[in-house]
Amino acid sequence: MDDLKTSEAWRIFRIQAELIDGIETLNDLGPAVSIFGGARFGEESPYYAAARETAALFCRQNLAVITGGGPGIMEAASRGCFEAGGTSVGLNINLPREQHPNHYQNRSLTFRYFFIRKVMFVKYAKAFVIMPGGYGTLDEFTEAINLISTERIPKFPVILVGSEYWKGMSKWQGCWHRLPQ
């Protein structure tokens, strides 16, 4: 039992190391936009095309683009930024399946802990673009809205892409008219 307590206590150093590595890697990034979206959208998806084009537009305005670094929407946004000559940041996560870093990243970090990864998304972004996705996208979206609504971070644009996709959430939540302006 003492070994378990000791190993758990040492976990704090791994958490601290991930946080320091993220800050050191991104500290000179400059203004950026975080684009969130699902891993399962392929190149044939209109959402893939929209993410690619949106990221390219941001990069042409000298904004870096931060994504989850994986496939699907994350790849599309990274690719659009990379092809536009911008800085594409991938915040990858160790998962048992699905998540593999895409090839369109100028800066890449891999995290074990979701909460440290989310700190990096929030700390360096001036806006969030939320594309269709799954539980991870929903988690990132609600984290951002919660931090803004509780005034833990300054208010900034949170853009939902795909009104039809988000309609059910909007109806369930009933709060879009109350989102921080």
Where would I find each of the regions flagged by the language model?
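Amphipathic, Lys/Arg-enriched alpha-helical "gate/interface" segment within cytosolic domains
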Residues: L26, A32, N94-Q105, F115-K118, ...
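Acidic/glycine-enriched connector segments
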Residues: G72-I130
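Alpha-helical elements of the RecA-like P-loop NTPase motor core of helicases
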Residues: E75, D139, K167
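Short amphipathic alpha-helical segments
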Residues: S78-R79, N102, E140-E143, K171-Q173
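Active-site/ligand-binding-proximal alpha/beta "capping" segment
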Residues: R112-E164
